[in-house]
Curated annotation (Swiss-Prot):
Domain of life according to the entry: Bacteria
Sequence positions that bind ATP: 29-32, 50, 86-90, 414, 478-480, 494
Protein name: Chaperonin GroEL
One annotated GO molecular function: ATP binding
Signal peptide span: none
GO cellular component, as recorded: cytoplasm
Provenance organism: Legionella pneumophila (strain Corby)
Assembly mode: Forms a cylinder of 14 subunits composed of two heptameric rings stacked back-to-back. Interacts with the co-chaperonin GroES.
Amino acid sequence: MAKELRFGDDARLQMLAGVNALADAVQVTMGPRGRNVVLEKSYGAPTVTKDGVSVAKEIEFEHRFMNMGAQMVKEVASKTSDTAGDGTTTATVLARSILVEGHKAVAAGMNPMDLKRGIDKAVLAVTKKLQAMSKPCKDSKAIAQVGTISANSDEAIGAIIAEAMEKVGKEGVITVEDGNGLENELSVVEGMQFDRGYISPYFINNQQNMSCELEHPFILLVDKKVSSIREMLSVLEGVAKSGRPLLIIAEDVEGEALATLVVNNMRGIVKVCAVKAPGFGDRRKAMLQDIAILTKGQVISEEIGKSLEGATLEDLGSAKRIVVTKENTTVIDGEGKATEINARIAQIRAQMEETTSDYDREKLQERVAKLAGGVAVIKVGAATEVEMKEKKARVEDALHATRAAVEEGIVAGGGVALIRAQKALDSLKGDNDDQNMGINILRRAIESPMRQIVTNAGYEASVVVNKVAEHKDNYGFNAATGEYGDMVEMGILDPTKVTRMALQNAASVASLMLTTECMVADLPKKEEGVGAGDMGGMGGMGGMGGMM
């Protein structure tokens, strides 16, 4: 296919036009007084959002070279969202600022490669300064404040996330679902829960809740289908003598085995319940092993030379209590050793770092949470579906931000941390004048997030930035109230990881764009006009009219 080429300044100007258009749309959402953006959908109601990455993802231009610039900055927002979960608007504003300042320098004849090296040196220095300024985020109050800021100053969201983290721990899984009412709700599932219920309703022993509840049961874990009762006789006899109930977790229990278990349960000979093992394939084997470690049991598997006929009570796990409903099984207070459980968690964490699949990482994180004890569900309440979507997106953003804060700590919010990190550039020198210019480009660019927050709030950006720069530490400007003061005391905090990733991703893409000298795109297809012969046919129609 034929290509169109653009070179030098012409190429960079086209790219810059796309970046500016995308950044203009994204930056209106920034800060406590940022506005919403309405996105058209191909079906259903439009989406209302204040999330930078959601806006960026929707934008595409017809002009190919403009679009290439916009797509590269979109990558900045997406990468920041994927790694830090928030800070997408900050990243976009920073990328645009670096590119605008850098383009002026390139147009003035400076070497783009040296500018890039200067920018990279400056980013490294600012990143180290941010990490030195970072304070650990340990208490619920700080977690709530981070959540509140990320959820667009919604204190209810910050509070519910802090409460959820307090209940399930920093490593616990917190999921966000659609609620039924107008208020946000938090429910916590203690112990390990997996999404498999009883195989037969005849196992129910609590008619009121339609559940099967077992107190201090044995747990038999089998990684194959059980269809013959003969295989299980020795285990069943041992359990019956002990007088304790039994939970069977197997790939499936069917036929004669299921019928015998149901009859024994109904007659009260052995109080028993059977459920299918969670997951599929290798994940099922791994989850069975998780349950075994949690309950101090053994998985009966022919792969490791254990047969069901030879199983004894020593191979069975134990727990304080088990509740089985139609859809879920919850193991509460398994009797596994803490050291073994922690070793298993460490092993799964190592797998999380190695995996490249987001889906696998999410599933591994769920397994960690189930072993660590607890899953919290935040149900988001809203009056309409449009509001529900918008609110749910804010809750998810806030959740990512609080996780990032717990991971790497917090710095003063509202763009103050970046202004303070400018100090790291005072003594930084490049190898030549062009590199020094690159350092100065970043010095100016890191003021842009605060400038945009202040502008969106209706104040004069230069006045505020200069006043904040004159002071030290956490002194900054609260754009929500129009007051100056200590940002940390006012509860305006940003996760260090979010600020760091936004800066690194923005500088990475913007400096690459500065070093662009040629752009290649497909030529637009020429639409073939309606053939002349067809028009002639139309003329013939006129002739027919004359015949009438």
